[in-house]
Amino acid sequence: MPPPRTGRGLLWLGLVLSSVCVALGSETQANSTTDALNVLLIIVDDLRPSLGCYGDKLVRSPNIDQLASHSLLFQNAFAQQAVCAPSRVSFLTGRRPDTTRLYDFNSYWRVHAGNFSTIPQYFKENGYVTMSVGKVFHPGISSNHTDDSPYSWSFPPYHPSSEKYENTKTCRGPDGELHANLLCPVDVLDVPEGTLPDKQSTEQAIQLLEKMKTSASPFFLAVGYHKPHIPFRYPKEFQKLYPLENITLAPDPEVPDGLPPVAYNPWMDIRQREDVQALNISVPYGPIPVDFQRKIRQSYFASVSYLDTQVGRLLSALDDLQLANSTIIAFTSDHGWALGEHGEWAKYSNFDVATHVPLIFYVPGRTASLPEAGEKLFPYLDPFDSASQLMEPGRQSMDLVELVSLFPTLAGLAGLQVPPRCPVPSFHVELCREGKNLLKHFRFRDLEEDPYLPGNPRELIAYSQYPRPSDIPQWNSDKPSLKDIKIMGYSIRTIDYRYTVWVGFNPDEFLANFSDIHAGELYFVDSDPLQDHNMYNDSQGGDLFQLLMP
């Protein structure tokens, strides 16, 4: 039984539902189409592809795997910057960080760079009721303290009331006292309000789906989940899925000899947690004691399984409301998270573990046949059920794709006009896209054909970047403010290699100097899939790299 709602939650829901009624009237006038597809966009925080559907044999994610079994799954999707606010603003506007000019958390793109349209704004302008639940935009300055309202949303976004406790002392330690720890399995009945943010977000999203079921207008619902973002604050029973004796270390837990210091992420954010501080770990390289490394990995995987239950409840409700046959579902993450690879933890780098993300699209009638009357595509699956079978993805693409392609792809799948490609420069253009339209991947001749889509992946490139304040790791290397950025690491990922150059950067002019090379990295994927052996030769310079930039 769900915990009783707070007065604040009931007030918000009442305001929202009354706003929906008002929005329905105005949006129906804008779009009288009754058969337009709805959109459910699920955005997860810090989720690398540690999922059964991506081949992870340890992680229990039956509900996300079930979604993938009816979907098109992209095996090689990459974020454009491995930190929350810049990545979210990038893919929600369809522009790269060098266009949004957001590399930190401290500016609002509409004021700082250009009045760029967003995905929900575009759907709203095309007759959709647009709704935000949980962490969609990063809260704060980077979304104008409003989650980009009123531009993007038909009414004010919802944030769970228990969100405010995420970084407070709610983790009960072995001493019986409460701490602000990294590892924070909890008894849900023992935490403030008797609930957790992602549980509240699921409940509110389901209530909105119930309201929209009878709507004459299509809806665009974005649901942002917090876990597995730190702190790892999740119901403690999920630890049982991952006994410590079954948890291995990262396959490459040492800092590679050839790694340039500028490329290293010193994981300062997790060092601030009380349980990590107690370990007295040296800065910047550590390492973290082996037994604690296992505990971090255990809690990350447990957080993923907890997240999976919330996704499962949301999709099961979509099914129960008979909306699965009229709703596109897109599932992704803002970036990945290192779990000890290269001696690193968290995001904040250009490595695959930080930039590689899940990207899954369910399109009714395209990626899967329409469900028969009474058929459930997404029945809730319990991750504690050991009898559950691993489900293979319905369709897969090995092509390299970027999160910046989410905007044109969702627009095209919904039958809206795909925004045009951006000119260079595009700061004056409100509606355009810098990502590719991925619609070609959804043109299936026969759902029974080879589930691996053909193509020439060597023609494709994914771009990422990360700023640094210094050539050597320091206290603000992970999250430098714009004024402190001295170096930008531009990274190209192809099917064959990852190539990164770290070049001088002028934060006042937002200008990279490719003749001022500080360091470089080159990893060949076939022979070095973990990216541990840097083959970069300083004589290669930045000329070739600059030619390959978008």
Curated annotation (Swiss-Prot):
Changing residue 347 to Q: In MPS2; severe form. Changing residue 293 to H: In MPS2; mild form. Liver, kidney, lung, and placenta. Keywords: Calcium, Disease variant, Disulfide bond, Glycoprotein, Hydrolase, Lysosome, Metal-binding, Mucopolysaccharidosis, Signal, Zymogen. Binds 1 Ca(2+) ion per subunit. It is an enzyme of class 3 (hydrolase). Changing residue 184 to F: In MPS2; mild/intermediate form. Changing residue 148 to H: In MPS2; intermediate form. It catalyses: Hydrolysis of the 2-sulfate groups of the L-iduronate 2-sulfate units of dermatan sulfate, heparan sulfate and heparin. Changing residue 422 to R: In MPS2; severe form. Glycans are attached at residues 115, 144, 246, 280, 325, 513, 537. The keyword Disulfide bond applies. Its main location: other. Changing residue 94 to D: In MPS2; mild form. Changing residue 465 to P: In MPS2; severe form. Disulfide bonds join 171-184, 422-432. Residues 1-25 form the signal peptide. Changing residue 468 to W: In MPS2; mild to severe forms. Changing residue 132 to W: In MPS2; severe form. Lysosomal enzyme involved in the degradation pathway of dermatan sulfate and heparan sulfate. This is Iduronate 2-sulfatase. It comes from Homo sapiens.
